[in-house]
Amino acid sequence: MPSTGLDKKPDSGATDLAALDTHLIAPPGVARRVFEQLRAPAEGAGFEIVRVRFGVQDGQTLQIMAERPDGSMTVEDCAELSRMLSALLDVEDPIPGEYHLEISSAGIDRPLTRPKDFERWSGFEVKVGLSEPLSGRKRFRGILQGVEDDEVLVECDIEGFSEPQVLGLPFRQLSEAKLVMSDDLIRESLKRQGPVNDDPDAPADGE
């Protein structure tokens, strides 16, 4: 599918999306270190880590979003993963001092962090932020059209065009991306996943 080339810089070469698979999952620092330590054990237990965040406001907190390969994540799954990761973190000890561990599903209006997320949820509305402006903008909202080469395709309204345009947003420049809550998204999420913990603020807690 063609995309507009508004204010795009020349590409320095093809980008391997597999190498970009972590920059939205876990930023450099504690979160990235934790992700790299826990990714393989989590996958071995049948889970995929969607996002890792570490914050220090109101005490140190480690937040991990995860799901099964089919996108499902029950309350029981959260509890199981919390027990497993708590034990691993006690051994690896990647965070100095005391901290609070929170395990949750990605929720319905979920963050999109991996190339396959953008393919899986093609056709639904998204909000995307960029680290660098494209055509003078850093934020876009439109209908996700999947991934092509090293770009995420989003159909959105652009000033100067009478019809919505499909923009190619460089994956390496994405700073955030998430689905927009809608009735269609709720129905599709329930259809695909079955019962799901759709409240990321109601995590399974660990020590």
From Swiss-Prot:
Pfam families named among the record's database cross-references: DUF150_C, RimP_N
Domain of life: Bacteria
GO biological process: ribosomal small subunit assembly; translation
Principal place of residence: cytoplasm
Subcellular location: Cytoplasm
A single cellular component GO annotation: cytosol
PANTHER family: RIBOSOME MATURATION FACTOR RIMP
Similarity annotation: Belongs to the RimP family.
Record-linked HAMAP family: RimP
Name of this chain's protein: Ribosome maturation factor RimP
Gene designation: rimP
